[in-house]
Amino acid sequence: MDKCLKKNVDEMTIVPYFLYPGKKVKIAVADAMKYQKNTKIKFVVSKPMTMHKTLVDLVDNRIDSALKENQVLLAKDSIDVLIIGHGSKDPNAKISIDYIVDSLRNSYRNVDRCFLEIEEPNIEQGIQICQKNKPEVLVIVFYFLHEEPT
């Protein structure tokens, strides 16, 4: 923020880089807006990325890449998918991951979700749910913006 504010601009657009709305987004936006009181630059804050078709496409591309890398040539409607989200106490987080899951359901045999922490089903439970469906191939997608869970 400091670097951007030193530039000669009239307006700054802030795009919250989060996969779901919640407490961290609210804190990040509030922290960014604190800078506005000390400048004449107009701040424009967009909605978080959360429920956007581009994110569905991104997850779908990850699935396609995993299948190609592993030389799986089955049709999509023969593939099962498990999406692992972080988990949150904020109910809006579940809405966002459910949007991704629901958007992919028409393309794949089964699409389920589970969570790293905080919410259930946890990863073990998520895999057990998938096993009951007797998948021929199960693609697991980690739905995080960072490489390692914090």
Language model: regions and residue ranges:
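Extended amphipathic ligand-handling, pore-lining, and cofactor/metal-binding catalytic surfaces
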Residues: M1-T150
